[in-house]
Amino acid sequence: MGTIVLKMTAEQISVLQKDLASYATATKNPYAFFSAKVDGTSVIAYTSGKVTFQGAKPEILASRFGYQAEPKQSPDGQNLALIGSDEVGNGSYFGGLAVVASLVTPADHAFLKSLGVDDSKNLNDSKIRQIAPLLEEKIPHKALLLSPRKYNEVVGDGKAHNAVSVKVALHNQAIFLLLQSGAKPDKIVIDAFISEKNYQKYFKNERNHFEFPITLEEKAEGKYLAVAVSSIIARNLFLKNLDKLSQEVGYTLPSGAGAKSDQVAAKLLQAYGDQALQTTAKYHFANTKKAYQRLK
């Protein structure tokens, strides 16, 4: 829910009152003399001359009464050829870990906006499944999927990776492969999951290196179309893997790591034993222990 506050003259407030008279509501606020509710947006006019608009999209109504949204500033590099990389599945008990790196140029922006490309966290799975194939066909990218079986072979105590270093390895490899395919970016951005210092610490252990500098930026999938594209393709790859695993075991495997995952994991243990979790889940998650506790 958003809130917009406008300082208005008495004349402007009078116009607002007339326009919204049919939407007027009662108010018990001693400092307010008018209130209304229009299509989910609440409006309150105060004796101080301030008027608040509050709702899911308050800017729509507020714009009728003088509100002008500040133009969004394009992040540095948005108008450059950009490689963006993102991962999906690291927070889900079931399913693999998908990492995708994509190259987006300014010439791609109109196409991407026509599809409604945005941070995949704001898109439902149905929409992601719909537009991901179009992105895969149009946008140069490299996609990697670490299956649960392989994940459990390399991640854990005494193994080659921990839960963070394995993501560094996958991001590095996806970007490396994209560069090797001929991609020529002006900038490379990864949706930040680690500090740059620690990223470089793990990066030094990688076999495949490249000289191009990397920028780690928080919430990059909402700022850069290249990262948004990678996020969407990675989410689709993760979902397809989850579907495949679900078919193999005969249970619908949920995304996430909540109580539902504990319940399904316990059913898998009862039906198939420990090996079922080794091949469908990230075994080191706390869900494994919780699933065993459910069987006691």
From Swiss-Prot:
Report any Pfam family annotated for this entry. Answer: RNase_HII
EC number(s) in its UniProt entry?
3.1.26.4
List the subcellular locations. Answer: Cytoplasm
Gene Ontology biological process terms in this record: DNA replication, removal of RNA primer; mismatch repair
Q: Does the keyword Nuclease apply?
A: yes
Instruction: Output the Gene Ontology cellular-component terms.
Output: cytoplasm; ribonuclease H2 complex
Q: Which reaction does it catalyse?
A: Endonucleolytic cleavage to 5'-phosphomonoester
**Binding-site positions, a divalent metal cation:** D86, E87, D191
Q: How is the cofactor bound?
A: Manganese or magnesium. Binds 1 divalent metal ion per monomer in the absence of substrate. May bind a second metal ion after substrate binding.
What residues does the RNase H type-2 domain cover?
Answer: 80-296
**Which InterPro entries does the record match to this protein?**
RNase_HII/HIII (IPR001352), RNase_HII/HIII_dom (IPR024567), RNase_HIII (IPR004641), RNase_HIII_N (IPR024568), RNaseH-like_sf (IPR012337), RNaseH_sf (IPR036397), TBP_dom_sf (IPR012295)
- What does the UniProt function comment say about this protein? Endonuclease that specifically degrades the RNA of RNA-DNA hybrids.
Family from the record: Belongs to the RNase HII family. RnhC subfamily.
Instruction: Specify the protein name.
Output: Ribonuclease HIII
State the organism named in the record: Streptococcus thermophilus (strain ATCC BAA-250 / LMG 18311)
Chain's gene name: rnhC
